[in-house]
Swiss-Prot record:
Pathway: Amino-acid biosynthesis; D-alanine biosynthesis; D-alanine from L-alanine: step 1/1. GO terms for cellular component: cytosol. It holds the Pfam family Ala_racemase_C. This is Alanine racemase. InterPro entries: Ala_racemase (IPR000821), Ala_racemase/Decarboxylase_C (IPR009006), Ala_racemase_C (IPR011079), Ala_racemase_N (IPR001608), Ala_racemase_pyridoxalP-BS (IPR020622), PLP-binding_barrel (IPR029066). The keyword Aminoacyl-tRNA synthetase does not apply. GO terms for molecular function: alanine racemase activity; pyridoxal phosphate binding. The gene is alr. It comes from the Bacteria. Disulfide bonds: none annotated. It catalyses: L-alanine = D-alanine. Substrate binds at R134, M307. The modification N6-(pyridoxal phosphate)lysine is found at K35.
Amino acid sequence: MKPFPRAEISRKALQANLARIRELAPQSKIMAVVKANGYGHGLLNVANSVATYDQGADGFGLARLEEALELRSGGVNARLLLLEGFFRVTDLPLLVQHHIDTVVHHESQVEMLEQAELTTPVTVWMKIDTGMHRLGFSLAQFDAIYQRLLACHNIAKPIHLMTHFACSDEPDNSFTQAQIDAFESVTASLDGDRSLANSGGMLFWPQSQRDWIRAGIALYGVSPMVGDKGGNHGLVPAMELKSQLISVKDHQAGDSVGYGAFWRARKDTRIGVVAIGYGDGYPRHAPEGTPVWLNGRRVPIVGRVSMDMLTVDLGLDSQDKVGDEVLLWGSALAVEEVADHIGTIAYELVTKLTPRVAVALLP
């Protein structure tokens, strides 16, 4: 018997998305970004699905060292990059031992590299802040820091170079081009690989594609742009979040449903209860009208989302019954559409599922 709620992860979809990304960026290597438990899809589920498919992903991007070590212990031998870099000097021997690249974005990391005693140099990606103003060295700092990295015996040469876009999901926003130009202004004559494009850069700013692209949300079949869908770019949703009806009851006009008697039926209707709630990661603030997919149609959420359940207005003439499968998002109901209704982004929905949701990797 299948558990509910459950997230079904399609290996076929992940592989199809990898192939599509190669079509979109044919001259670049692909770094599959699998941080945050593979964007909620399961770290090893994703990595093993795309590590050896066709050419396979050329590398994997992680946020934390623990994620990289999990990939290594899971048998993934591809190139790994810590996108936030290392946090402690004691992390450095682990980078050497497990052949893990690191971003360097702050002078404190440079100091740790200069002071460490390592048996083998570490491969470094110098992050340049071209306008995101989160991590990275400013353009004014660049030359001095780059020279220190060149002089450091604990750093493998050449030094690789990267930046991160603030607005790449906005095709009409010239800020991304300004970031590209800023990056080129300080790196044009230097050796080493370059990585500028994230999913938004790959899709909407092809001129940002360099040696490596960092494919995050696109790998999972989702568009980074609000109001857009991955399917518009030939991408396939990799996750289907499913549950089932556990109650179907008739209610009269004026009956309230849920905590706070927040919603009242405007006419006689039939209410279904779905076994999923904010304890599973479905947002409590989902407003009335947020759709779920049931028996071939969109059905609106009514009342407040509870910890373990949410309620939907089936309509008085519906034939839905207890045990019927409910799709919260997936192929028939894009996660981007659900996110738009809720007032969030698809990234947040897929990454916030809790351990109560069973995750199953399908062929």
